[in-house]
Amino acid sequence: MSQNKTNKLFGYCFATAALLCSSSSAFASEGFMPEYTCVTDAIRKDNRPEVTKRLFRSQAVEDEIVRVQKMLKNAKLAWMFTNCFPNTLDTTVHFRIGKDGKPDTFVYTGDIHAMWLRDSGAQVWPYVQFANKDKELKKMLVGVISRQLKCINIDSYANAFNDGPVGGDWMSDLTDMKPELHERKWEIDSLCYPIRLAYQYWKVTGDVSIFNDEWVQAIRNILRTFREQQRKEGNGTYKFQRKTERALDTMTNDGWGNPVKPVGLIASAFRPSDDATTFQFLIPSNFFAVSSLRKAAEILEAVNKETSLVDECKALADEVQVALKEYAVYNHPKYGQIYAFEVDGFGNRLLMDDANIPSLLAMPYLGDIKADDPIYKNTRRFVWSEDNPYFFKGKAGEGIGGPHVGYDMIWPMSIMMKAFTSQDNDEIKSCIKMLMDTDADTGFMHESFYKDNPQKFTRAWFAWQNTLFGELILKLVNDGKIDLLNSIQ
């Protein structure tokens, strides 16, 4: 996910494309883009790297791009889809055959040359649907899943990993760092995304080869970590501190964070934004844990015949689900019953939403809750309003941000999640139009943009958001909404 680096300024509208093509390490930054005059004809050519410089090529994905291009009448939308959908494959996937003769895939986030369990699982997710059409793509996906399982077994508390034991920028963090780790921020969702990816791969392909001893050991480590972070036996083994100017990059109370009461929920030291939680029972991530444990149980039962592990996964999922019903809901004076963002079990709660996924807004997208759930519908109205302290609205657009980038910065990811979870065509159309109008004429999505000027943005190369945009457009096409897309002016 995102990481704080020294701000750098990027140039005119081809800067993003040029740097993407060269895979330059200059992307290891976050910066606001100054205003510029964009060359009108820029949208006539795609901004993908040259074919010879693309890291991974899938014929099935290329065929799908052509199919969708032919259906889209809006030239800019077709151009953006062409740039964004393959961005993970073009620029971040490092596929190889390991020393054991098996596929191994290391996936950069984009400008940061490390592999986040969350980002990598989300980045390759929309390609799973093509696995049966492309043997090399299928191998690449096996490589991602295998790498993720190995990472979990190296350290189930880490969020991001290096390509080998090479150390990195955060080795001085006051936690149990290892040279294989890029960062060791404990985030519940880091253990959920690999299960989600493996489950979807299994459902699409029927391939059970990935569910080996490494998989079983990873599930054991996930269960151990989740249980420890229920805090029933004290604070557990994990603590984290960093010498930093950013308060949300470290934990309070000597690295343990704010206290929680053991009520069955799982504590998460950090959010999917990599920011520290205020109250450690992070509600969207606990919902994600429930659905992930149930998926793991289904695999373990059907493939591994691990009866005891199946029972453990189901029991923990049930326990967390009961606790969510009791502690996650708040009776808001304006919106009625809504889900809180964070709670501590003592009765304290934080009412907000952050753009990063899992979020309250994104819960139906992840399959954690039904979009027509009454409490979710109330929550959705709340988070997309100025009653959410991290909802911003300006001349360029509106959406949810978060403390990671700060005031007045809207994350396109939140706009995408509004579209993904919407049951209203006008709302979907408005979201797509907003995304098209806030790309700063680069043809790519960015981490965030300033509410009054999309040419001021952070992270020119953020593969997850790019691929997620492509995933959204493809879903709308496949859902029969091509007329809606073609009606956008």
Regions found by a protein language model. Name each.
Residues S29-R118, G143:
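Low-complexity, Ser/Thr/Pro/Gly-enriched N-terminal "stalk/linker" regions
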Residues D173-P179, R184-E187, L350-K370, D408-Q489:
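C-terminal capping/lid segments that line or modulate ligand- or cofactor-binding pockets
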